[in-house]
């Protein structure tokens, strides 16, 4: 049997149960070994973070299933959470994480790119409302929001302020 990323993805999707979902999968096949890296998404958690217990449970169940593929399939399995500062999937995560802080890479008038902190507002059509976030003024009520075309956002991450 050929052990492909697609075979492994199908197995993972059978093992996962809501509210857990597959966030990302990377499989690195070497001569007699595969490195399988899985990131989980927790669909009902505020930041989408899967717990350590969730990761352990999924890891155990996947290992049991992968062990049934036979001794000739040697693998290393790593299961983790996508995390509280995960990469955003645009545009869907802009809706999902509305109200949270994000670090977005956005264009400046000069044509250069800049990473800035924003609080996500509502998505309307092809634009999202963003409130520039400044730690010094975070409690002021008169912070101005801007509407930015989603297509202009190069990339982003959730941002966790501690």
UniProtKB/Swiss-Prot annotation:
Pfam families (alphabetical): RimP_N (PF02576)
Keyword terms, alphabetized: Cytoplasm, Ribosome biogenesis
Localization: Cytoplasm
GO cellular component, one term: cytosol
Signal peptide start-end: none
InterPro entries: Ribosome_maturation_RimP (IPR003728), RimP_N (IPR028989), RimP_N_sf (IPR035956)
The UniProt record lists the keyword Cytoplasm: yes
Function: Required for maturation of 30S ribosomal subunits.
Protein name (database record): Ribosome maturation factor RimP
The organism's taxonomic lineage, starting at the top: Bacteria, Pseudomonadati, Spirochaetota, Spirochaetia, Leptospirales
Gene: rimP
């Amino acid at each position: 049997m050929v052990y492909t990323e697609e075979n492994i993805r199908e197995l993972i999707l059978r093992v996962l149960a809501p509210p857990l979902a597959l966030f990302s999968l990377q499989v690195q096949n070497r001569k007699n070994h595969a490195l399988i890296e899985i990131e989980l998404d927790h669909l009902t958690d505020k930041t989408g973070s899967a717990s350590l217990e969730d990761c352990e449970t999924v890891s155990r169940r996947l290992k049991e299933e992968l062990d049934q593929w036979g001794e000739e399939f040697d693998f290393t399995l790593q299961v983790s959470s996508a995390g509280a500062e995960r990469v955003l999937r645009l545009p869907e995560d802009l809706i999902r994480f509305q109200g949270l802080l994000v670090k977005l890479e956005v264009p400046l008038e000069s044509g250069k790119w800049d990473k800035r902190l924003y609080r996500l507002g509502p998505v309307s059509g092809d634009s999202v409302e963003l409130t520039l976030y400044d730690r010094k003024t975070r409690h002021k009520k008169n912070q101005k929001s801007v509407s930015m075309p989603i297509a202009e956002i190069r990339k982003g991450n959730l941002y966790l302020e501690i």
